[in-house]
Amino acid sequence: MQKWQIELYSTPSWLLQTLLMVAAASAVILFLARETRFGREFAYILRLCLTPKSAVKVLLLITAMITLLLTEVRLNVLSTFMSKGLYDSMQDLNASAFWMFAAMNAGVVLVRAFNNVVNDFLDQGLAIKWSERLNEVLTTRWLADKNYYRLQMRRHAPDNIDQRIQQDAQDFIASTIEFVRGMVNSVVTSLEFAVVLWGLAGILTVFGFDIPHGIVWFVYMFVILATFIAMWIGNPLIRYNYENEKLNGDYRYSLIRVRDHAESVAFYSGEQHEHDQLADRFKAIIRNRWRIARQSVCLSGFNDMFTNGIKLFPIILQAPRLFAGQIKIGDIQQTVQAFARLQNALSFFRLFYNKFTAYRARLERLYGFLLSTEEQHSAQQPDITEVSDDLSLENVALFRHNGEILLSGINVNLKSGDSLLIRGPSGCGKTSLLRALAGLWPFGCSGKVSRPPHQDILFLPQRPYTAQGSLRDAICYPDIDKQHPELIEAMNTCRLGYLVDKLDKPDDWQHKLSPGELQRVAFVRALLSQPKVILLDEATAALDEPTEAMLYRVLKQKLPDSIIISIGHRSTLDQFHDGSTHVGNIDCN
């Protein structure tokens, strides 16, 4: 039995044995990687994405992908034997053998093409499923426990969270699949073609010393040396790529700010200022890109020089044996193919290193964001007791981010139907007190708070938020019945009747409506949701005094049992509240 026949018939057993060895090696590597920073960060994200229900499916999918990958390696090995037979048959002028090996080469090509198509489909399937799960984890963590709000209040908040959730997550998944596939392919190919090349190699004489199978030692030595040099050249790219993600996110955020505040910029004629700001941010991107370009050129230049420079070596090293009649043209062809496969496999990490630096940066950004969502619970919070109707604050104190006291000695006791007006200089903590009442103050708060459940508290800010979609979606945000029977009546009451015919029209209502219209939308929400506590933070600042008076009277008439707490500076607000309190002192700023 010829060697190509032995290799062909042993393929099924080889696949099974190699699959088991890959599984065992992967388990050992994952166990050892736990002690490295990279391994801990990767394992942390992986644990979040795997559930007991999905783990079995994922394991089966990965097993199928690895099996197809090993099949590809085996086909590459068989291809070298088929090519050897093809060239040997031409040298021997054996037509029947030539056509047999030509047919077998064609068969290998067809099987490889089918294998690659299925493998590519499984790759994309895993990427899509993983993307769904990781996106769910990231958005859930971001929106849980008001993290989306608290994170932006931190001094060292993660930058460009939207970019981390959308772009970094997708790139991380794609790079992980590419990296794992490349590593498995590299290791298995290195072992397989080292065996093939070992059988083809003769004695290599260097400076009078005979080295058996010298061509194998030659390729290993040179590729390992080149890998260490490439890592040394490319190491700064890890830092540069991390900075590149941050700078691009900052620039995109600046562009969005101009779009979202276009009217204010136009009123101020601030185009030049915005242009200068954007130019400065973009210059920072360009400076960093030049650093990346210089380092990448050095790395790619070295890689190209090594990859192309080593191609002739297998022919040069085997030529003396061909001229001596020890081997045939087919052996030379198989040597060239095996040498190239082995060199590429051993060079995987060297060639992938540039991508790995960007991959490492994305992993750190995702890990940093997820970790920050867990750290939010460390700040001291008041003792909150949920009651049915009343609201009270007992000895409540608020702290700044550095631990200094912002407010202290706050005592309030309000019954159902009571109303309170809070006054005080700007920056003294009036809005912060409302945040603490809603459980949103991120820097620490002490004391005792008794209030209705969170779903019975409605906050009306100075510039209300509207959801994307139709005007009906905007008004009924977040969970008011969109077919509420009193919706149109409430709109008419709040002087928004002229918008009734646009209720189901999709638009950017956050920017379409004026500040005064947005504030009236907030009052419509209050009338429809009928909360037990209404917190108004200068919620009528954009309205004229007659409209303000009308809206407060409507609240009192329609929601007589609701507790109303307002922050405002107008003296006209006094008549709509049972009492007022002053927050802050001369040192509050």
Residue ranges of predicted features:
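A hydrophobic transmembrane-helix motif
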Residues: T67, T71, T80, V111, ...
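Conserved "ABC signature" C-loop
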Residues: P464-D508
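Primarily ABC-family ATPase nucleotide-binding module
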Residues: A157, F267, Y367-L421, K448-P453, ...
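Membrane-integrated ABC transporters
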Residues: M1-S79, K84-N105, N119-D123, Y149-V187, ...
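ABC-family ATPase nucleotide-binding domain "signature/switch" substructure
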Residues: A436, A474, K505-N589
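An intracellular "coupling" helix at the cytosolic face of ABC transporter transmembrane type-1 domains
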Residues: Q170-S175, Y240-D260, A266-F313, K355-A358, ...
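Short intracellular "coupling" helices and adjacent cytoplasmic loop segments at the cytosolic face
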Residues: D92-S96, G125-I128, L138-I165, Y251-Q277, ...
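Cytosolic ends of transmembrane helices, especially the final helix of ABC transmembrane type-1 domains
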Residues: G234-R239, E243, L247-Y251, A266-G270, ...
